[in-house]
Structures are given as C-alpha cells and as structure tokens.
C-alpha cells in the first residue's frame, strides 16, 4: 500500500494572511483579541489561536467596548462594519482579498441598479457577508441567492434584461458551471464577472483531487466539517468514483478504510495546516503504508499583504 499526495493542498494565501493577522495582533497588542466567527474553518487552527489569546465570537455585541476585533477570512456585511464603527471598536480585516473582490462586484451592481444572483450555500458566513453588501437605499435592484440548478428553473427576477451573477469563492467548479449555464439559458442577457469568482486555490485543489482520484482507490481529505472547500474536495473524489472521507485529522481514520487498498490519496482543504497532513501520513504508515509520493501540480506563489499597522509593528 502506498500513499500519493495531491499538489497543491492545504493553506492558500487568504488563509495564511488571516491566521497571521490574528497571531500578529495578539503579539503586538496583547491578549485578548476578539475574532468575529472562526477566522478560518479549521478546528486545529482555531484551538491553537485560542491558546494564544484569541476569543472567538459570533456577534459584535459579545465584544466589550474599547477592544480589538478581527473579521474572519469569510468577510462580513456592511451592517457589521457599521456597527463596529459606531461602537468605536478597533478593527483588523482578515477578509480574503478574493472575497473582497466579490463584495466590490455586488456593491457596483447595486449602485448601477442591477439585479444580482449570488450562487452559493445559504447560511455560509461568506454568503451572508456578500449578501450584506447589498444596499437597498443605493439602487433599485434586488439580490437573490441560488444554491442549485433546480432553483434556477423557478427563479423570478424583476429585471431579466439587467442583472448579473457572482459566486461564493469556495464552490465546486463543476456544479457552479452547471448553474451558470442554466441561468444563461433562461436569461441570455445575464452579465458575469470578467474573471471567475471561484478562487485560484479552490480551482487548483479541485483539479489536483481530480488527478488524484484517477490514480487511487481511496482519497482522504484533511479538513473540518464546516469547511466548504474541504467538503467539495471529498465530494469531487466520490463523484470521480473513488471512496473518499473528510477527516479532521489522523485520529478519525478508520483502519477498515484501508483494508485491500493499494493506492491511498491524501489532500487537504485550503484551511487545513500541513501538520495535520503529516499526522495522517504517520498514521497510514502505522497501518501499513510503505511509501509516499507527490503529484506534480500547479505552482502557487500568491501572497496577500497584511494590514499596514501590523506590517509596521513587525518592523518596529
């Protein structure tokens, strides 16, 4: 039994930036530092930051006055930003710049009076933040959430000749393409972004899993259950006809999964650290794996800048 690693896997530039913002804020300003929502969707990362002095909350009313709050990588609504400003909270924004790009698109369409369809998963914090960029006082349009092709068939848009779509950044590329095609068939005048809203890291990791699935008879995806992009990786492997499981770490591996398997693929969602992958490899070795290889993959070199104040404090 051998193991094959997907490439790329694990942390993306947006996750790296978000985690680093929390760490540096704690180092420079001291604990506690409040973080609205899990800064990234990974249990191990969140627990580590808690130990360093981060306090995770779901709403700003849980943050005491005169404190610092960090917005998670998933982004927040304009209402949340306005509340933080009204209360005079010090804010560091860890929103992924690629999510911010989608926010700007929605705000631009709103000002232009267009209707907007957001393709995404209801209840996901990124979707809530993006929907919350819509300012009903700034335009005459409306924003709609679509989760699947079935909803497209019954969608009623007020301005079918004047609307655009955007997407959550961590969706299945294949599923999203199907929804966009269905929308365009019903509404030929629909506008879209100049570049796909699904982020480069999501695309690259899904391409890598598709390649992995061709070579393996089991694919393990390291990631937490609430991680959208990690769930999509496991779903994609199964769609390719391969047994696949989403695991938070080595402790969740069932030895029965590897019985009779010859080639085990391992990857990690964009919010899962390499240390968890290392633990999975060690556990697979205990279960009889005798070699680890790695696929060639799309190189990733993107780096997102930290907030200016945290960069300056590092120099000081």
Swiss-Prot record:
Enzyme Commission code: 1.17.7.4
Cofactor note: Binds 1 [4Fe-4S] cluster per subunit.
HAMAP family: IspH
Record pathway: Isoprenoid biosynthesis; dimethylallyl diphosphate biosynthesis; dimethylallyl diphosphate from (2E)-4-hydroxy-3-methylbutenyl diphosphate: step 1/1; Isoprenoid biosynthesis; isopentenyl diphosphate biosynthesis via DXP pathway; isopentenyl diphosphate from 1-deoxy-D-xylulose 5-phosphate: step 6/6
Protein name: 4-hydroxy-3-methylbut-2-enyl diphosphate reductase
Organism the protein comes from: Stenotrophomonas maltophilia (strain R551-3)
Reactions catalysed according to its record: isopentenyl diphosphate + 2 oxidized [2Fe-2S]-[ferredoxin] + H2O = (2E)-4-hydroxy-3-methylbut-2-enyl diphosphate + 2 reduced [2Fe-2S]-[ferredoxin] + 2 H(+); dimethylallyl diphosphate + 2 oxidized [2Fe-2S]-[ferredoxin] + H2O = (2E)-4-hydroxy-3-methylbut-2-enyl diphosphate + 2 reduced [2Fe-2S]-[ferredoxin] + 2 H(+)
Pfam families noted in UniProt: LYTB
Entry binding sites for isopentenyl diphosphate: 41, 74, 124, 227-229, 271
Cross-referenced InterPro entries: LytB/IspH
Keywords: 4Fe-4S, Iron, Iron-sulfur, Isoprene biosynthesis, Metal-binding, Oxidoreductase
Cofactors named for this entry: [4Fe-4S] cluster
Binding of (2E)-4-hydroxy-3-methylbut-2-enyl diphosphate, residues: 41, 74, 124, 169, 227-229, 271
UniProt binding sites for dimethylallyl diphosphate: 41, 74, 124, 227-229, 271
Signal sequence residues: none
Function: Catalyzes the conversion of 1-hydroxy-2-methyl-2-(E)-butenyl 4-diphosphate (HMBPP) into a mixture of isopentenyl diphosphate (IPP) and dimethylallyl diphosphate (DMAPP). Acts in the terminal step of the DOXP/MEP pathway for isoprenoid precursor biosynthesis.
Positions with a binding annotation for [4Fe-4S] cluster: 12, 96, 199
């Amino acid at each position: 039994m051998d193991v094959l690693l997907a490439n790329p896997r694990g942390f993306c530039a947006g996750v790296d930036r978000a985690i680093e913002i929390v760490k540096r804020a704690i180092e420079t300003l001291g604990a506690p530092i409040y973080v609205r929502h899990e800064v990234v969707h990974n249990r191990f990362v969140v627990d580590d930051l808690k130990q360093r002095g981060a306090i995770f909350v779901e709403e700003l009313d849980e943050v005491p006055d005169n404190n610092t709050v960090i917005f998670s990588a998933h982004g927040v609504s304009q209402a949340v930003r306005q509340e933080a400003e009204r209360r005079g909270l010090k804010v560091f924004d860890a929103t992924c710049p690629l999510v911010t790009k989608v926010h700007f698109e929605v705000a631009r369409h709103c000002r232009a009076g267009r209707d907007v369809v957001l393709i995404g998963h209801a209840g996901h914090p990124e979707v809530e933040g993006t929907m919350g960029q819509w300012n009903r006082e700034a335009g005459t349009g409306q924003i709609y959430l679509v989760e699947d092709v079935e909803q497209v068939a019954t969608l009623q848009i007020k301005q079918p000749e004047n609307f655009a779509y955007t997407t959550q950044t961590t969706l299945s590329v294949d599923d999203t393409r199907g929804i966009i095609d269905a929308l365009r068939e019903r509404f030929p005048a629909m506008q879209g972004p100049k570049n796909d809203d699904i982020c480069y890291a999501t695309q690259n990791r899904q391409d890598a899993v598709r390649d992995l699935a061709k070579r393996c008879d089991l694919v393990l995806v390291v990631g937490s259950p609430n991680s959208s992009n990690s769930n999509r990786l496991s779903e994609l492997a199964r769609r390719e006809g391969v047994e696949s499981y989403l695991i938070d770490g080595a402790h969740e591996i069932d030895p029965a999964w590897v019985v009779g398997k010859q080639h085990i693929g391992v990857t990690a969602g964009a919010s899962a650290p390499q240390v968890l992958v290392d633990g999975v490899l060690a556990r697979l070795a205990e279960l009889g794996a005798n070699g680890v290889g790695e696929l060639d993959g799309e190189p990733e070199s993107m780096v997102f800048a930290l907030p200016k104040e945290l960069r300056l404090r590092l120099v000081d």
